[in-house]
Amino acid sequence: VENTLLGLGCERSDFTRPTSEFSGGWRMRIELAKLLLKSPDVLLLDEPTNHLDIESIGWLEDFICNSSKAVVVISHDRKFVDDITTRTIEVTMGRIYDYKATYSQYLELRKERREQQMKQYEEQQKMIADTKEFIERFKGTYSKTLQVQSRVKMLEKLQLIEVDEEDTSRLRLKFPPSPRSGAYPVQMSEVAMSFDGKNVFSGVNLTVERGDKIAFVGRNGEGKSTLVKCIMGQLQNEGKLELGHNVQIGYFAQNQASLLDGELTVFQTIDDVAKGDVRNKIRDLLGAFMFGGEESTKKVKVLSGGERTRLAILKLLLEPVNLLILDEPTNHLDLKTKDVLKQALLDFDGTLIVVSHDRDFLDGLVSKVYEFGHGRVREHWCGIYEFRESKKMESRQ
C-alpha cells in the first residue's frame, strides 16, 4: 500500500490525512491506488495520466508492465501507450479496427490502410461514373433495357467504400507576426511564495532569455502554476520578478475557456482573430482541432469543457504575442491535435513556458527544464529526456 501511494506521488505525511482535505486531482490518485491494489483480472483505465506528474506516470508504467493482468487503456499520452501496450484498437467512422501493434506501429499500418482504401475508393468512383454514363446513354434504347436495369440495381445495392479521416497532424499553423521583446522577457531574483505560512518555493533566481522554450515540471502542489500566476501578476510574490521590454503575453490555463464569448459560433470565434494568410485555412485549422464540418457552426455556450479548451488554445495561437505561457495545454487534446499544437510551438519564434506532464509533447519542444520540488526551483539546460535520465542517475547514487 505504501509503495503504491508513494509511487503515485503521495508523501508519508499524507497517509493519515482525511481524503476530504485533498483536491480533486489528488483524490483521483487515491482512487487509482485503490483500483491497482484490488489486483483485478482486467484493468480499465480512462485517461489515467491526466492528474499525474511525470514521476508518477513513470511509476504507473512500471507497475502495469510488471503486472500479468490484462489492461485496456484510453489515453492521449503517446509515450505512455507506447510503453505499456502491445495492441491498438481504433474506433473511427462507426467501425473498429484491431491492430496487434503499439501505437507508433499502428500509425504506419493505418497509413498503409488508408492508401489502400483511397485506391479502392478511386477505382469504385470510376466504376460508378462509367456505369452512370452507360445508363444515361442507353436508357432509351430497347435492346439495352435489361443491361440498363441490371446496372441501376447494381448501383442501388452497391456498398460505398469509405476512406478514413485524413491525418491533419501535418497541418502547419503559422503564427501572426508579433513585436520583438527585450532580451530577457522574465527575470527573477530571490522570488518566494507562501500560503498560510507554508512555503511553496523560495530563493528562485532565474532568467528567461528571448527565444527560450522552457518546461515547468514537478509533482503536483510544488508551485508550477503558482509561479506562472506570479509572472502573470495574478499573485503577489516576495522578491523581485520583472517582465522585459515590450513583452506581450499569451496565457492559457484551464479556466481560460470560460472567458470565451458564448454567443459566438466556433467559426466566428476564430474568424475574429485570424489575420493574413491564415484566414484561408480557418476551416482546416478548425478541423485539426476537431471542429470540422457542422461542429464549426455550434455556439460556444453549448460546447463541453474539453471543446472550449481546444477552442481557447487555437484562438490563443492566432493572437500576436511574443511570450506564450501554457498551463497543461494537452489535457483535452487528442494525439493528432497535440501534434498540430507541438509543430506550431516549434515554429513559434517567441519565448515559451509550458507546464506539462506529457513527455512526448515536451520531447524536442523544450531545451530547458525548471524542476519544482522541496521548496526550490532548479534550472536544467537540457531536454525532457536528458532531464529524466539525470534524475534516474541521481536516484541511484
For each predicted feature, which ranges?
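Short, amphipathic alpha-helical segments that act as regulatory/interfacial helices
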Residues: 132, 156-159, 366
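ABC ATPase nucleotide-binding domains
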Residues: 117-139, 144-153, 169, 389-397
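Short amphipathic alpha-helical coiled-coil/interface segments
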Residues: 1, 150-159
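Amphipathic alpha-helical coiled-coil segments
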Residues: 157-167
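ABC ATP-binding cassette signature C-motif
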Residues: 1-121, 170, 174-397
